[in-house]
């Protein structure tokens, strides 16, 4: 009886979330944003987040501009952030963006760009799927998920140097300070990646995306020249780490003082400049599972 009650509760909860899952593409061509709200909790500086701004490298492209405020404290959500007005669920997510190049001005800056879903439900726990970049090394991409209850979170993740094609790690861990347990078999596909010789997330726009299913998550990007989809991680073969309840679709940019990129352990400095993230568009298309 308890199991039946829980399954019924889960179905009702999922239905309530899923009814808001409608496809959209936010182009950021106007000052007003249709599908997202401001989610920042830091300073209220007007320059931090602006839509309809001209790109610094593509004059014909209007963008969402996120700029770090040097007065913001460390922590996710302190810097600029947008959060979808409605819940999103299983389906295909993609975005075209360019992260800042901080290497000349402040090579040891501690700053994170996050492209992700996130919702912490008091009963079902955390539902997060993410892409992350640390400004100190724009050749490296972090992808993964967070699931579970507060204090008992679980992470599955892969770290990639796309310029060299090296997979630095593919692993599971408990909580933020847990030990990495490497994956093998179907959870570790593809085992090898082809390098993109001139990959630099701060040099140009790239299109990134992930496909979220109940039994599988695939992270990918489009090759900047051929447009071919390059699969970064096709995680399947286990239900561990796959969020099952709906979430909120997000983009953020923030100072991290306790997470340094693998290639530069000193990259924890508070930002000294108003580094700018440029987002061309964000899209979401629900799947038939939803």
Predicted regions and their residues:
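Sec/Tat signal peptide C-region and signal peptidase I cleavage site
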Residues: 14-18
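GH16 jelly-roll
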Residues: 19-290
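Sec-dependent N-terminal signal peptides
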Residues: 4-12
């Amino acid at each position: 009886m308890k199991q039946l009650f829980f399954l019924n509760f889960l179905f009702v909860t999922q239905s309530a979330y899923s009814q808001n899952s409608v496809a959209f593409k936010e182009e950021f061509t106007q000052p007003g944003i249709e599908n997202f709200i401001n989610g920042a909790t830091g300073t209220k500086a007007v320059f931090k987040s602006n839509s309809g701004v001209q790109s610094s490298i593509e004059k014909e492209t209007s963008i969402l501009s996120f700029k770090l405020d040097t007065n913001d404290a460390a922590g996710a959500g302190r810097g600029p952030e947008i959060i979808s007005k409605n819940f999103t669920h299983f389906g295909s997510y993609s975005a075209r963006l360019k992260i800042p190049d901080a290497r000349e001005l402040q090579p040891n800056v501690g700053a994170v760009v996050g492209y992700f879903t996130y919702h912490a439900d008091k009963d079902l726990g955390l539902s997060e799927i993410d892409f992350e970049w640390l400004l100190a090394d724009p050749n490296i991409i972090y992808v993964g998920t967070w699931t579970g209850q507060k204090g008992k979170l679980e992470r599955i993740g892969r770290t990639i140097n796309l310029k060299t094609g090296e997979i630095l790690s593919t692993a599971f861990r408990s909580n933020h300070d847990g030990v990495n347990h490497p994956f093998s078999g179907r959870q570790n596909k593809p085992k090898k990646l082809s390098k993109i010789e001139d990959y630099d997330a701060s040099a140009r726009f790239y299109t990134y995306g992930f496909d979220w299913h109940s039994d599988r998550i695939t992270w990918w990007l489009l090759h900047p020249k051929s447009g071919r989809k390059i699969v970064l991680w096709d995680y399947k073969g286990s239900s561990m780490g796959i969020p099952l309840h709906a979430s909120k679709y997000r983009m953020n940019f923030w100072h991290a003082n306790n997470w340094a990129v693998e290639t530069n352990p000193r990259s924890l400095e508070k930002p000294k400049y108003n580094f700018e993230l440029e987002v061309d568009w964000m899209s979401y298309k629900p799947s038939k599972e939803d």
